């Protein structure tokens, strides 16, 4: 089953104002203009800045709110970001993305208010018993102008969001990566992070500005749960991951980075997930997703 691609294009909502009688337009055009202007200000002031949604699983009706690109598909209530064969085994050289069609407001330039948000999701990354596997997935926040690259250029360590040309400099994109393979731009194997899987925060580049060890289990029956928080008051972006059956965030893996997101992202942003495989493979499935923001 194939779904329409997700191109990070905001769907504008048109607001229609009833026609104004010509009598008022000719005699009181200035006064009427002021009234209309004040009315529109009231409308804008009362627009709800909070955003929230919850997908405990992904049913076909979710397609009304979600967009897909490249290899990402919805199957049996689960979003598969990268390709599998008929037996469920992961395939090489795959990349896929999905995200919310409706943009999220990160901040209000007029009032200066900035949103705080929490997003939680459950995921499964299965190596199918391979000792060497890759490449990982990421939660992204990006400008609506950002264009998802072709999978042939963004596979492998680029996590489906970068290419060789854009890897070290891309505008208006922030990723939280769940990286299962250490590339040359990742933490040095001699560092305290060791070799292999790690959490990372990427700002306009595939090279992370912050890293932490990703303690994981790539068994096919293991489900991980992640929580990403942004507190606009202290500007901390926090990542928590657990494999606890109770879903409690008990510090299995964590990463905190101080960042003013408004410096790197526009008022309205697109949010979603991306993943890729290269010569090494693993599955990348998102099982549930919720998001709440308030300003």
From Swiss-Prot:
CDD domains: lectin_legume_LecRK_Arcelin_ConA. Glycans are attached at residue 152. Residues 1-22 are cytoplasmic. One of its GO terms (molecular function) is carbohydrate binding. Residues 46-295 are extracellular. May be involved in arbuscular mycorrhizal (AM) symbiosis with AM fungi. Belongs to the leguminous lectin family. Keywords: Glycoprotein, Lectin, Membrane, Transmembrane, Transmembrane helix. It is a single-pass membrane protein. It is found in: Membrane. SUPFAM superfamilies: Concanavalin A-like lectins/glucanases. GO terms for biological process: response to symbiotic fungus. The keyword Disulfide bond does not apply. InterPro entries: ConA-like_dom_sf, L-lectin, Legume_lectin_dom, Leguminous_Lectin. One of its GO terms (cellular component) is membrane. This is Lectin 11. It comes from Medicago truncatula (Barrel medic). The chain crosses the membrane at residues 23-45. Induction: Accumulates in roots during colonization by arbuscular mycorrhizal (AM) fungi (e.g. Glomus intraradices). The lineage of its organism: Eukaryota, Viridiplantae, Streptophyta, Embryophyta, Tracheophyta. Pfam families: Lectin_legB (PF00139). Its main location: membrane.
């Amino acid at each position: 089953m194939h779904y329409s691609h997700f191109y990070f294009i905001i769907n504008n909502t048109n607001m229609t104002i009833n026609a104004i009688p010509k009598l008022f337009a000719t005699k009181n055009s200035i006064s009427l203009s002021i009234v209309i202007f004040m009315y529109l200000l009231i409308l804008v002031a009362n627009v709800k800045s909070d955003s929230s949604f919850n997908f405990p699983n992904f049913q076909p009706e979710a397609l009304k709110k979600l967009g897909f690109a490249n290899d990402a598909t919805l199957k049996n209530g689960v979003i598969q970001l990268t390709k599998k064969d008929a037996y469920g085994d992961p395939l090489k050289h795959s990349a896929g993305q999905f995200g919310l069609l409706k943009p999220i407001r990160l901040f209000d330039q007029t009032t200066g208010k900035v949103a705080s948000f929490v997003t939680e999701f459950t995921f499964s990354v299965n190596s199918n018993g391979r000792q060497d596997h890759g490449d990982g997935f990421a939660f992204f926040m990006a400008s609506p102008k950002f264009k998802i690259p072709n999978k042939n250029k963004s596979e492998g360590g680029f996590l489906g969001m970068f290419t060789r040309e854009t890897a070290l400099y891309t505008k208006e994109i922030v990723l939280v990566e769940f990286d299962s393979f250490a590339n040359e731009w990742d933490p040095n194997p001699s560092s305290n992070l060791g070799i292999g899987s790690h959490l990372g925060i990427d700002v306009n580049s595939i090279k992370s500005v912050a890293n932490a060890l990703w303690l994981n289990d790539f068994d096919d029956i293991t489900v991980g749960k992640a929580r990403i928080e942004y507190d606009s008051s202290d500007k901390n972006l926090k990542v928590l991951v657990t494999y606890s059956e109770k879903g409690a965030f008990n510090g299995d893996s964590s990463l905190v980075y101080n960042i003013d997101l408004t410096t790197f992202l526009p008022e309205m942003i697109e949010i979603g997930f991306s993943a890729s495989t290269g010569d090494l493979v693993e599955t990348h499935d998102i099982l549930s997703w919720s998001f709440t923001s308030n300003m």
